[in-house]
Amino acid sequence: MREEVLTMGKRARQAAHHMAKVGDVHKRKALEHMALNIEGAEAAIREANDKDIRAAVAKGLPAAKVDRLRLDAKVLEEMACGLKEVARLSDPVGEITRMWTRPNGLRVGRMRIPLGVIGIIYESRPNVTVDAAALCIKAGNAVILRGGSEAFHSNRCLADILRRSLVETGLPEDAVQLVGTTDREAVLDLLKLEECIDVMIPRGGEDLIRFVAENARMPVLKHYKGVCHVFVDDEADPDMAMRICMNAKVQRPGVCNAMETLLVHAGIAQRFLPPMAEAFRAAGVELRGCERTRRIVADCAQAVEEDWYAEYLDLILAIRVVNDMEEAIEHITRYGSQHTEAIVTGNFERAHRFLQEVQSSLVLVNASTRFNDGFQLGLGAEIGISTSRLHAFGPMGVEELTTTKFIALGNGQLRS
């Protein structure tokens, strides 16, 4: 298996060298052709996907996991639309981000270049095969994909379509490769391939991400989990705060930018929490609170220490009453995952302090945590949300799949 993975790495390195020179018009054409081929291969994709669905049901996987595997007509349409949207994004490769002139007349700047070869290890959702490959191609990279065993047939079918599309548009098919085995040893071999892979990106549950982070020999862009907070200040507009909290928790509770802990200033807790709790209960949210919360909210379960660290991904919410913003920030610093935090307040100074002192990938004032998303922030498609501070912090779009090199323009300058 080691030799097979090494061969893939070498082919990816050659493909990456070619992709770095490809212009935007050519990349756009390839991505649009991928979309057409996805649309034209619906029957073949559905047939492969049915094999995965039947196997998942036979294994007794939970209905939610089976649903994540499903590639119906709507998902395939979204997949094709996603490819077209990525094709239309601005190409960052070759962009000169800054330029300055030295006293000797030497002009120095920074130019965006592809990362090179990207490895992506992911679970369940077969649409990641297409989404990840599209972003890597747009940024001029090659990618090696290793999907979850549950989606093996779907991933293989989709990867074959992408590779054929590359060939049909004159690009190297090895710019997209899929590890063709469900053997877990292949994952370890991939993580040891630092001579061929420039960066590894895991997408999935916390266990997978920790495994990759602990075993990879190359840099890893990751996010462990989203323990997201909303702090309702005593100078908040209560109606606005209720709308924001409902959206942050209830709209899509199973995603990483959903609120998991609500922090409420003691000065507003008595009048804010009862109607807020009633609205949450009407939406089916289970509430777990601190002692002060339980004195205000009837029938609220006792929160324990583990609740403050929890990423529920469900209709469960931890609530804590705090004395002031300083205590709220201390709580976020101790228990948060540096993903997304929001403050609801009408006080400019407190909002500014919250923005400065809370060190998460997105910090919001008077808006829902659900906005930590590439499209919602105007960045376009994303490969995930990084909670690593090195290289990328927050949504990882096309630009985050590039790096910069220095360039210098002279007219004969010599160093004295």
From Swiss-Prot:
Function: Catalyzes the NADPH-dependent reduction of L-glutamate 5-phosphate into L-glutamate 5-semialdehyde and phosphate. The product spontaneously undergoes cyclization to form 1-pyrroline-5-carboxylate.
GO biological process, one term: L-proline biosynthetic process
EC numbers on record: 1.2.1.41
Localization: Cytoplasm
Broadest EC class assigned to this enzyme: oxidoreductase
Any one GO molecular-function label of the UniProt entry: NADP binding
Known catalytic reactions: L-glutamate 5-semialdehyde + phosphate + NADP(+) = L-glutamyl 5-phosphate + NADPH + H(+)
Coiled coil: none
Subcellular location, principal: cytoplasm
InterPro entries, per database record: Ald_DH/histidinol_DH (IPR016161), Ald_DH_C (IPR016163), Ald_DH_N (IPR016162), Aldehyde_DH_dom (IPR015590), G-glutamylP_reductase_CS (IPR020593), Glu-5-SA_DH (IPR012134), GPR_dom (IPR000965)
Gene3D superfamilies: Aldehyde Dehydrogenase, Chain A, domain 1, Aldehyde Dehydrogenase, Chain A, domain 2
Family from the record: Belongs to the gamma-glutamyl phosphate reductase family.
Name of one Pfam family that matches: Aldedh
Pathway(s) it belongs to: Amino-acid biosynthesis; L-proline biosynthesis; L-glutamate 5-semialdehyde from L-glutamate: step 2/2
Keyword Cell inner membrane part of the UniProt annotation: no
Species per Swiss-Prot/TrEMBL record: Syntrophobacter fumaroxidans (strain DSM 10017 / MPOB)
Record keywords: Amino-acid biosynthesis, Cytoplasm, NADP, Oxidoreductase, Proline biosynthesis
GO CC terms, sorted: cytoplasm
NCBIfam families listed in its UniProt record: PRK00197.1 (NF001221), proA (TIGR00407)
Name used for this protein in its record: Gamma-glutamyl phosphate reductase
